[in-house]
Amino acid sequence: KEAYLHPDAAKALLEAHLLLKAQYPSYRLIIYDAARPMSVQKKMWDVVKGTSKYMYVSNPSRGGGLHNYGLAVDISIADSLGHPLPMGTEVDYMDAASHITNEAKLVREGKITQQERENRILLRQVMKSAGFRALPSEWWHFNLCSRDEAKQKYKLIN
């Protein structure tokens, strides 16, 4: 499989990979989604609009999201065998258990384990150190910049 990013995001992602390898040589980053054309964004939005899951997909009529600029990545960490580390939910799980804002509470309630929380924290540490920003509602999603900055400096992928 292939994933595409804007060169600025690809450079930052390589930095995140190197930071992870420096701490955990047997780990690697695993990419689930990267650049996404607006035509695909519209199809995704059509599936969730009018449902309780709409908040997890950027509305294309509002300019879409950072995936549509090649500046966002959905990512996790894999072990030496290529198996994703446990993070408490699957990627694209559209529920509060995916949010990063209340992870301590999720552990207390038994919705995720302490190890899953620590794995999420490790992912955030390497991604943030490389210049990415975490999305509060999705532990796997990272943006290179703000939406306003993307609109000013980059082009949408159609």
What are the residue ranges of the model-derived segments?
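Cell-envelope/glycan interface and biosynthesis
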Residues: 1-158
